[in-house]
Amino acid sequence: MQQDILINWSPQETRVAVLESGAVQELHVERTLERGLVGNVYLGKVARVLPGMQSAFIDIGLERAAFLHVADLLGAHPAVRGANSEERDAPLVPIEKQVFEGQALMVQVIKDPIGTKGARLSTQISIAGRMLVFLPQDDHMGISQKIPLAQREALRLRMNALAGPPDAPGGGGGFILRTNGEDASDAELAEDIAYLRKTWARIKDASVHLPPQSLLHQDLDLLKRVMRDLVGELTQSIRLDSREQFQNLLAFGQEF
């Protein structure tokens, strides 16, 4: 069924309605001041390492330093995927052997600041796409647990073929197929893979050229999530009441 998307934008709030045959099927609202930090990627600077707590405070340019626990450090566990149970249960590598004060560290917010507590961080980066989640530092190919078990292996084989060899130019990384990607075509999945890898390339490039305490990647706002998640072959029109935001959407669509 064909759909129309109506967008009302103001500096304080964005509202999106998805219509089918003139009837509202979905309504999304995002208030600017209530946007969280989860998903944002920063180039942080280690401010303090606390061996007793197996954690570190990271300055990411916010009012309060953010918190990084050893369990959220990439490479904290010596075991590799597929290792036996004894290796998987091996102790974590102590945080003081992995990070040091003054070190620049790429981190992602996994929990928003609450009260007097700063944001919680991870060095294990994940980037959400329309149908996939990209794990650029991993090689795992996962399938949503909500997809029937009988279909997962075939989907995993498809994903491995579409992702290509890890040593290919622009290749590498792991993916998780989200539930809404179960019936996606190869072309749709390949498009999402390309978008996610391009996003990661931009993040890496920014991490080289920007100083510590810089924002490298901000999770998409509602307008861009509309383009990523809602616009498809059945979309016959998008109506937006802001010329400036219309130009931003055009630029986003052309770039990705």
What is the role of each PLM region?
Residues M1-F256:
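Single-stranded RNA-binding surfaces
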